[in-house]
Amino acid sequence: MAGFDENVAVMGEWVPRSPSPGTLFSSAIGEEKSSKRVLERELSLNHGQVIGLEEDTSSNHNKDSSQSNVFRGGLSERIAARAGFNAPRLNTENIRTNTDFSIDSNLRSPCLTISSPGLSPATLLESPVFLSNPLAQPSPTTGKFPFLPGVNGNALSSEKAKDEFFDDIGASFSFHPVSRSSSSFFQGTTEMMSVDYGNYNNRSSSHQSAEEVKPGSENIESSNLYGIETDNQNGQNKTSDVTTNTSLETVDHQEEEEEQRRGDSMAGGAPAEDGYNWRKYGQKLVKGSEYPRSYYKCTNPNCQVKKKVERSREGHITEIIYKGAHNHLKPPPNRRSGMQVDGTEQVEQQQQQRDSAATWVSCNNTQQQGGSNENNVEEGSTRFEYGNQSGSIQAQTGGQYESGDPVVVVDASSTFSNDEDEDDRGTHGSVSLGYDGGGGGGGGEGDESESKRRKLEAFAAEMSGSTRAIREPRVVVQTTSDVDILDDGYRWRKYGQKVVKGNPNPRSYYKCTAPGCTVRKHVERASHDLKSVITTYEGKHNHDVPAARNSSHGGGGDSGNGNSGGSAAVSHHYHNGHHSEPPRGRFDRQVTTNNQSPFSRPFSFQPHLGPPSGFSFGLGQTGLVNLSMPGLAYGQGKMPGLPHPYMTQPVGMSEAMMQRGMEPKVEPVSDSGQSVYNQIMSRLPQI
């Protein structure tokens, strides 16, 4: 406020924009002298009540009247001269101008703080006491004084009467703000009054009218309005401010909790209600959002409708994609659950079993690839085969299918679990979702996974058959050999291999070829000793050891189709190097039967050569090495043993045959490995 004298208070510089209240008051009463004294007393009273000065009314009156002719140079003189009247001045003699009010909070500030741009200091002098305001209430400060034009000024000359008059006014004083649209004064202070309650007003979008303000809170509002505190109002204002702030904080806290509950229900609860019951069967992480994409399925047993729920970064639902159409009516409201998280109802369990069984059937002759490109599962006509050489395959899972986008691995027919591999996430009879959930995804996700795991344990037993136990015995055999494949008396089919962490040698997976047998094994070399072969067997065979090893009559799928009973009635004999045969594949076999032996084979015999010794090649096998039978006459039913080409020990006739569909492999016989494995398996209880 440049240009103001430093000893002049702010109130001294206020200039009313309208004619002086003293002029109006003198014209109403008719006696200038008495009206001036009343006006000075009224201004002194108003200043003491509004501005917060504690000076006595009588002392203020005496000092103001004695110093009414003292003017200081400044902006007020120029404005007063221009307006043509003398503005009432404020006594600043007892005001400390050099006191720092910010240091001592008990000191009273005589200045008026105005923060609203629409409020002018001159409007404060436009008191409704001296103006005709129909909207003002009839009170000593907001209405008109009971002064009539004919009132004698001597009636107010008595000091006792005047003291009693103003004492009554001070005792019954209360600030009643009029309607905010009635005057410019309250229009300009609307923003100031709503500062402390801005947060509450913004949420509730409601404004408190002047009639709803209680008298007990009017002093608080007026003191906060002017930014000044008096001694008698200091404690009351502080207490009221604390109470008001506490109540507002309570309201804010309640509303924040309400909004948080709404947000949590939208983020982790049921999606938008559409009238149907849904069961969550999977979720998947989405790039750019910490909330996963959720997948739901209708809980009706005959309904195949699914939906996908996308969420924003804040957890709000942004998109719901439906797949299919409902073939049933909406369930009653009392049976709607929004979303069945744990799936405790029997209907959901039956539906899940039907879906899983249908998935088993539909997965045949298909090839699926997981989201991480680590598992490449090749499925045969009636069984699953794992064939990924570079990634980590889940050897304990019986199949992998994809329902929509989430990757769900169902362990229903497998009993092979690999504890050495940290990458294998599948467990016996459990559901492993592609989304790990960051350590469980919270308490709800852990309970949900546990519930699904318990349900699928029973389902795995049903799918695998009553003759299989959920937890199969495990046998680990470690031998020393130069070859990876050890002969243990059973026939195995390799269905995959993988690279194991910390071991440069791959791990190979095999499955017993006997129908109905689910025994599996994996073979790997030790990382510290390349000659040490570790073979781990999972499960127990439900059949006897095959009669012969490395034979084709019982291997693969031939063991159960009755070829041993003489399925081929026509035999081709080879005599003196002459033969006649239809074209066939490289590894096809020609079986010759006679009346005495169920197993025989076309071999090249020269009757005039006598008992042959050594080896010869079968005419019917191109590029394959076959064994001759020394001392065997043509047509002889029982044949003696012949020396093994490698171990020089007697073997049976069926040893000379190869399995159908298998490549020729050199498999050394390990009596120690076979005997150890057979001894261990013989100790296990029969199934």
UniProtKB/Swiss-Prot annotation:
Which is one GO molecular function term here? DNA-binding transcription factor activity
- The region called Disordered is annotated at 197-276, 324-384, 416-453, 537-599
Cite the SMART domains for this sequence: WRKY (SM00774)
Q: What Gene Ontology cellular component terms go with this record?
A: nucleus
BP term (GO), one: pollen development
Biased amino acid composition, Basic and acidic residues: 578-589
Instruction: Give a yes or no for keyword Metal-binding in this entry.
Output: yes
> What does a knockout show?
Strong defects in embryo development.
Keywords, A to Z?
Developmental protein, DNA-binding, Metal-binding, Nucleus, Repeat, Transcription, Transcription regulation, Zinc
Record InterPro entries: WRKY_dom, WRKY_dom_sf, WRKY_plant
- DNA-binding region, residue intervals: 267-331, 481-546
Which domain of life does this protein belong to?
Answer: Eukaryota
Instruction: Supply the Pfam families for this chain.
Output: WRKY
> Which residues take part in binding Zn(2+)?
C298, C303, H326, H328, C512, C517, H541, H543
List all Gly residues biased stretches: 435-444, 553-565
Q: What is this protein called?
A: Probable WRKY transcription factor 2
What organism, scientifically named, is this protein from? Arabidopsis thaliana (Mouse-ear cress)
Q: What is the lineage of its organism?
A: Eukaryota, Viridiplantae, Streptophyta, Embryophyta, Tracheophyta
Name of the gene encoding the protein in the UniProt record: WRKY2
